[in-house]
Curated annotation (Swiss-Prot):
Pathway: Cofactor biosynthesis; riboflavin biosynthesis; 2-hydroxy-3-oxobutyl phosphate from D-ribulose 5-phosphate: step 1/1; Cofactor biosynthesis; riboflavin biosynthesis; 5-amino-6-(D-ribitylamino)uracil from GTP: step 1/4. Its cofactor is Mg(2+); Mn(2+); Zn(2+). The record marks 124, 162 as: Essential for DHBP synthase activity. This is Riboflavin biosynthesis protein RibBA.
Length: 396
């Protein structure tokens, strides 16, 4: 359905437009996207005529500050946090509204010789302030446009325009696919762009290493930090990991289960079972700081409250506005590669974890079950994971 990110990057490099689609649970829209330094009046005219949305120019915060172009409002209450700045025209424009004068303004925004006094405010081009870190920090069209320009080896700025149908409503995916076919444009998703960056960029660095004696044996503990978010994770290593395949457990943080002994989940029991087995056989345990299946500790407690009222763990997440599972495993894959592990036997009941690790280049040769006997408090939770989340659990 979607084109390859590599092909889209090549089109951006050649000055072509593509269509970028975001998540159906977000804005669920498609934008025409191209590199700002490649724009022409014909491109802007196409966007105005066929896209029909607002023509905007995503740029880095650094560049906007250099040009003295600041945010439109001090208190941004937009629910998607779209970071509009004051609109601008290039000083030599007449009205600034024509496709060709708008293209001129865009070109001057990315011209290294431009100065703050070269732009009048307000104008007819709407710069957008992209977040540092791009789609890995905010999964929006603003960040996607800048990321694509950078990946194409061009200046970090794009031109975007929403695609609106003839009847005035937003074009959704079926409409966008037809639009792409009609005009011969490639179409990609922000989700695929995120995966591409996670797979091809180094996003974690090793910070510290020490010996860690435990009741399950003597481990080596290695501390890692995510480069963009500063989030911290650890890996516990036991024995000779050069003998592949290596036994691996990737465990997501659960304060209530791992530390406080909660009976509502099987997390703590799984953690200790994994440490015991790795202590005996050798291997690696990666401990990821993605509490509550990625929603955080306080939201997890809110989800517990909803479960007390009768909702299951999936329904509780959705009620709070989250997907059933927000976890992702690209960082774990990068940690394992840094350690030197490529071929693994993975201790998990979660087939999604296996799929993601394979997508990120690890050779998963075996799934090792890690089932815990259910108790009165977590039986419904485990049954929900099996029936609604596809976990491979036999005991419930």
């Amino acid at each position: 359905m979607f084109d390859r990110i590599e092909d889209a990057i090549e089109d951006i490099k050649q000055g072509k437009m593509i269509i970028v689609v975001d998540d159906e649970n977000r804005e669920n829209e498609g934008d025409l996207v191209m590199a700002a330094e490649k724009v022409t009046g014909e491109h802007i005219n196409f966007m105005i005529k066929y896209g029909r949305g607002l023509v905007c120019v995503p740029m880095t915060e650094k560049r906007l500050n250099e040009l003295g172009i600041y945010q439109m409002v001090e208190n941004n209450t937009d629910h998607k946090e779209t970071a509009f700045t004051v609109s601008v025209d290039y000083k030599e424009c007449t009205t600034g509204i024509s496709a060709f004068e708008r293209a001129l303004t865009v070109k001057k925004l990315v011209d290294d010789n431009s100065k703050p006094e070269d732009f009048t405010k307000p104008g007819h081009i709407f710069p957008l302030r992209a977040k540092d870190g791009g789609v890995l920090v905010r999964a929006g069209h603003t960040e996607a446009a800048v990321d694509l320009a950078v990946l194409a080896g061009l200046k970090p700025a794009g031109v975007i325009c929403e695609i609106i149908k003839d009847d005035g409503n937003m074009a959704r995916l079926p409409d966008l696919l037809e639009f792409a076919k009609k005009f011969g444009l490639r179409i990609i998703s922000i989700e695929d762009l995120i995966k591409y960056r996670m797979k091809n960029e180094i996003l974690v660095r090793r910070v510290a290493q020490a010996k860690l004696p435990t009741k399950y044996g003597n481990f080596e503990i290695v501390g890692y930090e995510e480069i963009l978010t500063r989030k911290q994770h650890v890996a516990l290593i036991k024995g000779d990991i050069n003998k592949e395949p290596v036994l691996v457990r990737i465990h997501s943080e659960c304060l209530t289960g791992d530390i406080l002994g909660s009976l509502r989940c099987d997390c703590g029991d799984q953690l200790h079972a994994a440490m015991e087995r790795i202590g005996q056989e050798g291997g690696v345990l990666v401990y990821l700081r993605q509490e509550g299946r990625g929603i955080g500790l306080l939201n997890k407690i809110k989800a517990y409250h909803l479960q007390d009222q009768g909702l299951d763990t999936v329904e509780a997440n959705i009620k709070l506005g989250f997907p059933p599972d927000l976890r992702e495993y690209s960082i774990a894959a990068q940690i394992l590669k840094d350690i030197g592990v490529k071929k693994i036997r993975i201790m998990t009941n979660n087939p999604q974890k296996i799929m993601e690790l394979s997508d990120y280049g690890l050779d998963v040769v075996e799934r090792v079950s890690i089932e815990i006997c259910p108790n009165h408090y977590n039986e419904k939770y485990l049954k929900t994971k099996k029936e609604r989340m596809g976990h491979l659990i036999l005991e419930v």
